[in-house]
Amino acid sequence: TEAENIRNVELQGVDMIGFIFYPKSPVVCADARDLPACAKRVGVFVNESKENILMYTDRFSLDYIQLHGNEAPEYCRSLHNAGLHLISFSILLPKDLLSVSAYNGLCDYYLFDTKTPQYGGSGNQFDWNLLHRYNGPTPFLLSGGINPYSVKALREFRHPYFA
């Protein structure tokens, strides 16, 4: 069951577990009983209204909000000002790193993931080497095709702002 999966993941010592609140996703969080006891709860949203994000945050006691759509800095500012902890960003090319500066101070973390035309996880491996060019003040998390074969590279990845 989903609850068993969450407990098993939590037993691995993870810091955060993401829950999808995007209706078009094949995996959508619907039951508060399935939430982790210790790991931080991250709600993943795609172009969702502020009102719905606030409602889900309250209902599921979310610790972080991951924005995975086309959210503008002004929108992130309104969520940040409402007291929400934000995680956001997808990049494709080195030049995409330049656009993150507009979000400085609005996101608690950036999640650098592979940018694709569709929303959600593509399974495409993200080129973490692009991040050696990142020198912003916001710490970041990695995503993008993480699997058992990439764990070694993930553990070896070093950057002063890698959380």
Annotated model-derived regions:
Residues 1-163:
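Conserved N-terminal beta1-alpha1 strand-loop-helix module at the mouth
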